[in-house]
């Protein structure tokens, strides 16, 4: 049975009517980063948790809307938020940072009018910890196990929008290639293609032998804190690091090794031509995992002409938790909410 809860979070003023570049200029000239944070006010959301099964593996699902579903009402568009290698879903997409404004993508996209879902992959968060590696392939199976519950609860059978963060974007890409009829519009945040000239992956590959021999890797406080400084200092509010540590470490100080093994020894995971859905590839200016040239190579091979490539200024690898995160929300929602073309020739 689903676990129904209610909680209160902040309301932000939605940035509308201007492009991403103009929004960046407004944020950089009108106020300091501390003053420019999205405003927070009291608001109540409708939340539920569910448990999916992949054999004996229990997978925790999360859901948020502005209001409870009402029988007979048209369903809301469904969006699934997909976490990366080192953090589970709720610390990634529903983080509270005291005094620093809104960080919760659950809140933001519920306000935009979506039925928002997320999953803790095998070995992460509230899902089962197993002897498995929880690699990209396993993540695809986890997403597949999630689908019957999403369909049952939302009454929507296909066209699920998905936003993947880092290795979560690789999971989304692989899932979309295998299940083209399930997905709608896709956002690949902090994506990785071949890893060519990546300083972060070059450094990470020094531990390849460890990744091959161990199904879990250390993920201590210091590693979580480094996410906010390793690419470019000043792109994140360091209060966010403290909040993330407090939210994530209760789940333990290790995480599965599979995605690190995939990203240091098996890239490219999926060829661009295999993804038929509309895609937004979105990269932070200072991302140390994937170069702009590598991602433009991937982008140029996407077969669907309904595609966009966006570089966000003043941001590093983790767009979800960066100081300029409003730009990420704006770009993602604008792409997901695009009108359908009148003609395709």
Predicted regions and their residues:
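Alpha/beta-hydrolase
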Residues: 200-282
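Catalytic histidine-centered segment of alpha/beta-hydrolase-like enzymes
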Residues: 315-325
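Conserved acidic catalytic loop of the alpha/beta-hydrolase fold
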Residues: 141-158
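Short, surface-exposed "cap/lid" segments of acyl-processing enzymes
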Residues: 70-75, 79-111
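Conserved alpha/beta-hydrolase "acid-adjacent" motif
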Residues: 288-294
